Amino acid sequence: MRCPDCDDGNGNEIDRREFIKTVAVGGVGLVTTAAPKLYGSSETLLARPKAKERSETLAATLYKSLSGEQKQKVAFPFDHPLRSKVDNNWQITPVTVAEFFTPDQQAMIAEIFRGLHNPEFVDKVLYHINEDAGGLGKYSVALFGEPGGGAFEFVLTGRHCTARCDGDSVEGTAFGGPIFYGHASQSFNEKPDHPKNVYWYQAKRANEVFQALDGKQRKIALLGDPRQEQGTATVELKRRGDKILGLPVSEMTRDQRELVQKVLGDLLLPFREADRVEALRDIEAQGGFDELAMSFYKNMDIGNDSVWDVWQLESPTMVWYFRGAPHVHVWVNIRTRA
């Protein structure tokens, strides 16, 4: 896809507004065969006013249905430190959905979780939830704040999941805070082609970017060891001015940059429309696309096949870290800065 009105003469410049339109509408709906025609026109998408999502409404209903005893276990002040935590395999409260909530409440939780995802992708998410942990009943839920009284957020956690529903309570923060998703398909140690892993398509798209790089660019983009997985610290953002390793997107050719747009589209594909658009706006808010750098990591290459299992996109306002060895872990944090 090309932006006919924003070429700088060298074919490198991609207009910021066009970037949002391309990825939010075309980058997910048109360049990804898994989800054709998912969105309306870009003008409608970007102009649409914020509306209370069904998941937010259900989260409020869930809160109001809690007994006093239940609230003591799963309801917290909005500024409680648990709300900002993220990890790859953890229980935000010591009680699980299946053992603690009534059948009606369990049904609401399932519907809230479904509503956080693209309806064209949610069955894949539930497939990995079932394979990884035996279903949503094994996960845990916490509620922060009170609906109707200001900021309010629903958080669901468990193996390979930290998901949030916040209704824009956290200004300038995509998804309501850092999130995690992942999948161990068929075994803990996946094969090089990651058979039936529902998120491996994202790495395949990222490797298309690497294949499009010239030799000099590859030397800059291909690094040794990736960041360590350390819970919330994994997605700590760099300060503006700190060095971000990898190949800056601003130094890529136009065709390469368009491939990065497709990567972003595929990364956002699993999520509901409101979160996709919010994430793109937050990425773009302070020079986002030009601020991104992309890196690949050779020291965690399953099968030594030079199809890079571990890679990331990073800027001062974003970390999207895909660690595909020994199976897929994906860490995400997108936050604008004042």
Language model region names:
Residues 7-9, 25-27, 38, 180:
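Intrinsically disordered, low-complexity segments enriched in small/polar residues
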Residues 1-18:
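N-terminal secretory signal peptides
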Residues 17-20, 40, 48, 52:
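Generic alpha-helix initiation/capping and coil-helix boundary signal
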Residues 36-44:
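Signal peptide processing junction and immediate N-terminal pro/mature segment
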Residues 15-31:
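N-terminal export leaders
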